[in-house]
Swiss-Prot record:
Protein name: S-adenosylmethionine sensor upstream of mTORC1
InterPro entries assigned: Bmt2/SAMTOR (IPR021867), SAM-dependent_MTases_sf (IPR029063)
Organism: Gallus gallus (Chicken)
Residue ranges of the TM segments: none
Amino acid composition bias (Low complexity), ranges on this chain: 1-16
The encoding gene: SAMTOR
Amino acid sequence: MEAAPRSRPRPGGAAASPPPPPPPPPPEQERKLEQEKLSGVVKSVHRRLRKKYREVGDFDKIWREHCEDEETLCEYAVAMKNLADNHWAKTCEGEGRIEWCCSVCREYFQNGGKRKALEKDEKRALLASKSTPALNASQPPKIEDPLPNFGLTNHEAITEELLHSLGKIRLLDVGSCFNPFLKFEEFLTVGIDIVPAVESVYKCDFLNLQIQQPLQLAQDAIDAFLKQLKNPIDSLPGELFHVVVFSLLLSYFPSPYQRWICCKKAHELLVLNGLLLVITPDSSHQNRRAMMMKSWKIAIESLGFKRFKYSKFSHMHLMAFRKTSLQTTSDLVSRNYPGMLYIPQDFNSIEDEEYSNTSCYIRSDMEDEQLAYGFMELPDAPYDSDSGESQSSSIPFYELEDPVLLLS
């Protein structure tokens, strides 16, 4: 029986062994790679929406088709929840936006912020009533003690308004995804999203939500109504919530008009003196987007709000607006208020979007000035309407597209 032929050794020595497998990436690098992949999913959805809007121009049609694309929406919801659970929670500002909302609500509803705002309104009204007759009088007005006791009627109105705030704070979280406010005891939370990531969030297209007449019920009956909502939500009564939250919501929409519609619906859903909390991503230093934030402030206040608080984190702007009138007071004839809710990406061309798909495009300061030129006629508003807080800052930050998705 013949022996099996032996394999010939390779020239120059013994047979080479296969190379060892590459070492696995360190945990931190692996986490960052996963975060980049997830943020890429989210940003690609935003880019496609903006691209379609530029190509088609019909934002109703684009949004309707987007809401019917269940596969993309589910992928988006899973990516957002994963980012929030496994990445943002490990950084101070990923959790900070939720904590900021809670802090503002506690300050306003529980620690005297609302009372101070109402008393400030009363002082303004009193000063206005004194100065108006003086404009038409030939003699200077009689000098009285500055800001004496306010009228009993106004004090009673303030007390009644504050008493209505007792109990849980009714909060609507629009674009909730994973219902982050549910864990806070002080809130009766309703989270809505076009594709919820968890069962506790209701399915709802906020842009097309129908607003009905307000409920004429006691507070406990309204609370019971909210606990028995049917899924999906197609309509809600007006003046139902103490707080409406837009956390990273408005920049999702490709059209400024859609952002405007959202703010208008928030005004209709809020009780008088309720809060609209708006958080939008931005990694640039504070003053670089000062013109944009001033534009947003004027547009939102035109609906019947006053800004109560403003903060700048390294990756986002955070604003709280107080509803000061029951009716929307905006004059769309003389001012293009919807167009004032712009974001930097609104000015990108399709080529810019394609470029940003492969690398991070950083706009120059000169380009920023050119984009903001159309809003140069806006009046100066260096302080908050209610809080008097300055918007100045000298902390340097660096800009990324949708930077909040890649917190480091």
